């Protein structure tokens, strides 16, 4: 949209826009010229410099690219057809021993193939609050990609962040808090790339709803993709934050998103690509489109786009033509090719890497070579990951763990396994509220993959019953089942579904709520497990006296049932915490409950205005003093923990803005200078060992009441005490100064809060800068 627009041209565009502002409110705007200039143009596209750890890879890449013909350079920039099951392919250059690239979904496990694992989802890892677990999951999951000949893992996800409660893809990301999301994406990128598989962190940026995410036809008229309209401060403090952590970790590629940003498409937005990503953050890798997200030709390349997937109709020979006629500099094409090849070298894929797509058959149901991606060494991480993402939110009368039950009654559609386990079976053409025919272990769309097996709750419960001599009655289809009055406990299983392509129809469904209430009416010990692909409100029944325990089980992957039984019987102690806020009623989410819809005069150009600024989720609840059902960071354990001994070091006196320095990957290196250290002691005051997530929140002057700025998950034996430490760096303590275009330390008193959740903070203190 903004290609080659100089100051005079920009002034003209702004003048045009000012004229258009007088359009009648009851008539739709019909031309995108109305929006010109709303996303500032940033040109030229900066060349990769090979800074830091990228130096050797860039030296090799420049030498490689210098040997290429113009056509070979162009071929590196767009996907091509190949006889394999990869999501996308880059063609080989045999004369230079470049075998091409296979890129494949997703951040939840390898999609579209066999002999791989279905891992706990991003949301499930977010609920674990475990950085070491996030890294180990990434290492072992990426190893499966490597064995299958996949060069680029299309993940992890930190966009959507989770602004909209009903958004369909929130389950793919970690949390709607940028700090938690950023800490976990750093570990995920670093872990996956440690085994030589490139990550493609996505979806950059502000892809916060599925509704109108792509342009489409409405009554024969084209409707543009939704525009996420945001101010610079909110962009930096919320949505760019986790992408910055991904770049800091060295993410080899970034996927630009379908939506528009300030009315310029994400894959041709020079402000977000050239300005924020490649200049401010010092990104050294390449920018890849989401599938079909290219909406411009040369303008996209000039705006910072490097690779189009799965193919292109507007680049190809047009790139060389553009260079010859001066529309595009030859150096831009060289930089595109160099960034792509440098990432290949950075991952050491030029040596001892399987042939691209070697284990990705084009047709899984036709004869093909068996390539085993799974490894027995992953079993522990699969199970541990599944366990730690469960969050116990209610446990009256110590209903859990179960105590040698003689009779268990199991109810609910979510208890059983699927009738069939097929390739990517759960990509639906619409989004129902629930998956009513089977347990939910993963969401839908490109983030889903094929499990090696599904261990459903009813199967795991019956295995345990066999060992214990417990009788099990079950009815997994009735909405109002009969209940044996002598049963020790009634286990009710429901779910809440979400998928790519559609936003959720709500945060609860009447059928599931009715089932819970019907069972609770007849059973004095009703234990509810919810497999939820996002926020699920429970106000209809959470306070029922017979609902004794509730678990948010999220999306645990293939070891779902096995993990749950470990928790139900106390062999594992719940340690998960909510990575989002559960409201008492959906109205408490305000304007951020539903996705934005087209409205006159923007019926043809849907607008989503991020007017709430940084106040989403718990920040919004804190500002409005709304009592949540279960606050951000909340989660129960079978033991108890006391907090004491808060200590705050003398802060390092620092200038308001970071000292000038050469930009490294991740931005100004002084952003990571430590300013102050906070420590506290945690004592396990219960009778069993457990893990606690100690959370640090900071009240920054002139900012939200409090913001997460540290967390540590520690194992503590019964009666023992351990210390946790939180190092706070410059970025942690800064706000974005729009005028200075810098992170700025605030002068004044910073409040310090340490505790169990965003609302349970027994330790408080302060320091002054």
Curated annotation (Swiss-Prot):
Species in which this protein is naturally found: Aspergillus fumigatus (strain ATCC MYA-4609 / CBS 101355 / FGSC A1100 / Af293) (Neosartorya fumigata)
Organism placement in taxonomy: Eukaryota, Fungi, Dikarya, Ascomycota, Pezizomycotina
InterPro entries: Cellulose_deg_GH3 (IPR050288), Fn3-like (IPR026891), Glyco_hydro_3_C (IPR002772), Glyco_hydro_3_C_sf (IPR036881), Glyco_hydro_3_N (IPR001764), Glyco_hydro_3_N_sf (IPR036962), Glycoside_hydrolase_SF (IPR017853), Ig-like_fold (IPR013783)
Sites carrying sugar chains: 28, 75, 262, 318, 325, 396, 437, 510, 546, 625
Intracellular or extracellular location(s): Secreted
Protein family (similarity comment): Belongs to the glycosyl hydrolase 3 family.
PANTHER family registered for this protein in UniProt: BETA-GLUCOSIDASE, BETA-GLUCOSIDASE M-RELATED
Name listed for the protein in its UniProt record: Probable beta-glucosidase M
Organism domain of life: Eukaryota
Catalyses which reaction(s): Hydrolysis of terminal, non-reducing beta-D-glucosyl residues with release of beta-D-glucose
């Amino acid at each position: 949209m903004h290609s080659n627009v100089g100051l005079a041209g920009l002034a003209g565009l702004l003048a045009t826009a000012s004229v258009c502002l007088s359009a009648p409110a009851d008539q739709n705007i019909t031309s995108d010229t109305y929006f010109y200039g709303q996303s500032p143009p940033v040109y030229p596209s900066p060349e990769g410099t090979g800074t830091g750890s990228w130096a050797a890879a860039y030296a090799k890449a420049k030498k490689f690219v210098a040997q290429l013909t113009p056509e070979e350079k162009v071929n590196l920039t767009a996907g091509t057809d190949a006889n394999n099951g990869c999501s996308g392919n880059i063609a080989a250059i045999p004369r230079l021993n470049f075998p091409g690239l296979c890129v494949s979904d997703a951040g939840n496990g390898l999609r579209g193939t066999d002999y791989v694992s279905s891992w706990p989802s991003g949301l499930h890892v977010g609920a674990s609050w475990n950085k070491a677990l996030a890294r180990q999951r990434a290492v072992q999951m990426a190893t499966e990609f490597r064995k299958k000949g996949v060069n680029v893992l299309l993940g992890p996800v930190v966009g959507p962040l989770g602004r909209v409660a009903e958004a369909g893809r929130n389950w793919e990301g970690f949390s709607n808090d940028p700090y938690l999301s950023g800490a976990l994406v750093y570990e995920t990128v670093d872990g996956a790339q440690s085994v030589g598989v490139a990550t493609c962190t996505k979806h950059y940026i502000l892809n916060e709803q599925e509704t109108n995410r792509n342009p489409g036809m409405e009554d024969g008229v084209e409707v543009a993709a939704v525009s996420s309209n945001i101010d610079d401060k909110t962009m930096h403090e919320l949505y760019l934050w986790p992408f910055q952590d991904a770049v800091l970790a060295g993410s080899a590629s970034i996927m630009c998103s379908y939506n528009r940003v300030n009315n310029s498409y994400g894959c041709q937005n020079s402000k977000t690509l050239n300005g924020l990503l490649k200049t401010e953050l010092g990104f050294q890798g390449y920018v890849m489109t989401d599938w079909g997200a290219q909406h411009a030709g040369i303008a996209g390349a000039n705006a910072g786009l490097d690779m189009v997937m799965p193919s292109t109709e507007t680049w190809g020979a047009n790139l060389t033509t553009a260079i010859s006629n001066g529309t595009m500099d030859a150096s831009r094409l060289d930089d595109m090719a160099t960034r792509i090849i440098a990432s290949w070298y950075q991952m050491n894929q030029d040596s001892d890497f399987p042939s691209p797509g070697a284990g990705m058959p084009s047709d899984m149901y036709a004869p093909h070579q068996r390539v085993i991606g799974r490894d027995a060494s992953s079993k522990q991480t699969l199970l541990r990951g599944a366990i730690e993402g469960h969050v116990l939110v209610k446990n009256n009368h110590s209903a859990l763990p179960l105590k040698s039950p003689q009779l268990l009654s199991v109810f609910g559609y979510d208890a059983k396994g699927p009738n069939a386990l097929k390739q990517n079976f759960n990509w639906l053409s619409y989004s129902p509220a629930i998956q009513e025919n089977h347990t939910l272990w993963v969401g839908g769309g490109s983030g889903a993959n094929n499990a090696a097996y599904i261990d459903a709750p009813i199967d795991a419960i019956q295995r345990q019953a066999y060992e214990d001599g417990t009788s099990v009655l079950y009815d997994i289809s009735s909405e109002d089942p009969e209940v044996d009055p002598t049963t020790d406990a009634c286990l009710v299983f429901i779910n809440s579904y979400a998928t790519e392509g559609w936003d959720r129809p709500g945060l609860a469904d009447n059928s599931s709520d009715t089932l819970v209430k019907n069972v609770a009416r007849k059973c004095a010990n009703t234990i509810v497990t919810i497999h939820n692909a996002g926020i699920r409100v429970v106000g209809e029944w959470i306070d029922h006296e017979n609902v004794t325990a509730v678990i948010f089980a999220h999306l645990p992957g293939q070891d779902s049932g096995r993990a749950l039984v470990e928790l139900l019987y106390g062999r594992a102690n719940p340690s998960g915490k909510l990575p989002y806020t559960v409201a008492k009623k959906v109205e408490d989410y305000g304007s951020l409950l539903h996705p934005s819809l087209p409205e006159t005069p923007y019926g043809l150009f849907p607008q989503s205005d991020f007017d709430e600024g940084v106040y989403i989720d718990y920040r919004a609840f804190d500002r409005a003093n709304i009592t949540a059902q279960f606050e951000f960071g909340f989660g129960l354990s079978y033991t108890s923990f006391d907090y004491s001994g808060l200590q705050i070091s003398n802060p390092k006196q620092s200038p308001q803005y970071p000292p000038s320095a050469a930009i490294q990957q991740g931005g100004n290196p002084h952003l990571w200078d430590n300013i102050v250290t906070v420590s506290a002691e945690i004592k396990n005051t219960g009778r069993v060992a457990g893990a606690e997530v100690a959370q640090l929140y900071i009240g920054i002057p002139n900012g939200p009441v409090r913001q997460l700025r540290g967390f540590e998950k520690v194992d503590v034996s019964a009666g023992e005490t351990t210390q946790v430490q939180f190092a706070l760096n410059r970025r942690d303590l800064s706000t974005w100064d729009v005028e200075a275009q810098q992170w700025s330390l605030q002068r004044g008193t910073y409040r310090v809060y340490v505790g169990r959740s965003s609302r349970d903070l027994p330790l408080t203190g302060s320091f002054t800068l």
